[in-house]
């Protein structure tokens, strides 16, 4: 409601501890065929609007993991140390399991593509790209359930301060990513 996702198909994602994606389905409580949940988006005296809901369990918590490992001092340092390319380093940020659409609490994170040339900048880039990839996968699931592509994504939350993450998100989605103040 706060990001003005009033039309059917409007989508938003909050990048906090996790990443939480919602897409307006209008006045119809649409049931997902692909592992998403259905929620009430808002209710007024005049109407009830519904949304599809999907989650990525580890977003800012994956960044906190980088600080716990001593690879960055804080989330604010990410963009300053990130490498221009991951050089093949890949990260699946399932540090707390996988949420929608897999629902696998037993899933573990995966880091691959490391070499002696890998730096902390490559690891930071891989974590950010891994978060963006999970959100992009969710958007594909949303589009399948909605029967139409989602044309833009409105975002908020602490991680939206990372220009690198937001650019990775836009690149993977190939739609505008509109950052709302957090």
List each model region and its residues.
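Active-site core segments that coordinate phosphate-bearing ligands/cofactors
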Residues: 1-182
């Amino acid at each position: 409601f706060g990001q003005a996702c009033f039309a059917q198909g409007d989508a938003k994602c909050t990048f906090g501890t996790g990443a939480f994606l919602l897409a307006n389905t209008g006045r119809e409580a649409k049931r997902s065929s692909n592992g998403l949940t259905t929620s009430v988006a808002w209710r007024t005296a005049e109407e009830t609007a519904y949304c599809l809901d999907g989650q990525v369990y580890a977003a800012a918590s994956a960044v906190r993991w980088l600080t716990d490992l001593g690879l960055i001092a804080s989330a604010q340092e990410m963009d300053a140390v990130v490498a221009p390319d991951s050089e093949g380093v890949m990260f699946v940020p399932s540090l707390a399991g996988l949420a929608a659409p897999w629902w696998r609490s037993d899933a573990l994170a995966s880091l691959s593509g490391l070499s002696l040339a890998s730096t902390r900048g490559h690891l930071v880039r891989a974590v950010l790209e891994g978060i963006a990839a999970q959100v992009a996968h969710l958007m594909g699931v949303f589009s399948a359930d909605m029967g139409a592509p989602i044309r833009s994504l409105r975002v908020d939350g602490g991680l939206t301060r990372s220009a690198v993450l937001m650019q990775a998100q836009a690149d993977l989605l190939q739609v505008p990513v509109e950052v709302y103040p957090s």
